[in-house]
């Protein structure tokens, strides 16, 4: 297991972008934050408030799914207790959530993409399916997760998405 964790750390370190300002780093920062839970809670709240008969149940299903997934992620994180990679960026994450496994961001974005595939509309599903892996990779690029964290998050988010589709199927 130790060798696997060392390989994970080496691969993750290769994926990191420089700490100095630049276009790639700026894009990675925006992508990494676009999966933040507060952003999605606010957006889904607005969608429910302003949306019509299609969007209101959509927003509630996604919100309830995100909340349930967050609880599962927290239980796993505080059971495994894997420390985040060392680094400068993400001080808020490092203080409020020092554990990296699994990536809650990766789990959340995959869950959202799968729900969009199931509920539609299809153009949104396509956009979210492109966006989700970019968010997850940006988390590694910014140094707040290891590659295995986002892989586990993807698996967890996909499983949660399939379950949520069964629960919220119309």
Mark where each language-model region is.
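N-terminal transmembrane-helix/juxtamembrane module of multi-pass inner/ER membrane proteins
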Residues: 1-41, 73-100
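Hydrophobic alpha-helical transmembrane segments
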Residues: 35-48, 130
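Interfacial segments of alpha-helical transmembrane regions
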Residues: 44-72
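Membrane-water interface at transmembrane helix exits
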Residues: 48, 72-81, 117, 165-169
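Membrane-embedded catalytic cores of phosphoryl/pyrophosphoryl-handling enzymes
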Residues: 89-170
């Amino acid at each position: 297991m130790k060798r696997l964790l060392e390989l994970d750390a080496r691969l993750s370190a290769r994926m990191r972008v420089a700490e100095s300002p630049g276009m790639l780093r700026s894009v990675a920062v925006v992508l990494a934050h676009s999966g933040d839970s507060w952003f999605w809670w606010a957006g889904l709240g607005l969608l429910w408030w302003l949306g019509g008969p299609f969007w209101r149940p959509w927003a509630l299903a996604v919100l309830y799914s995100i909340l349930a997934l967050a609880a599962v992620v927290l239980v796993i994180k505080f059971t495994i207790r894997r420390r985040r990679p060392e680094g400068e960026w993400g001080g808020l994450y490092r203080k409020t959530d020092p554990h990296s496994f699994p990536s809650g961001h990766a789990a959340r974005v995959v869950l959202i993409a799968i729900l969009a595939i199931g509920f539609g509309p299809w153009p949104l599903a396509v956009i979210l399916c492109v966006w989700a892996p970019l968010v997850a990779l940006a988390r590694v690029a910014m140094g707040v997760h290891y590659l295995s964290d986002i892989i586990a998050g993807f698996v967890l988010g996909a499983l949660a998405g399939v379950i949520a589709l069964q629960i919220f199927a119309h």
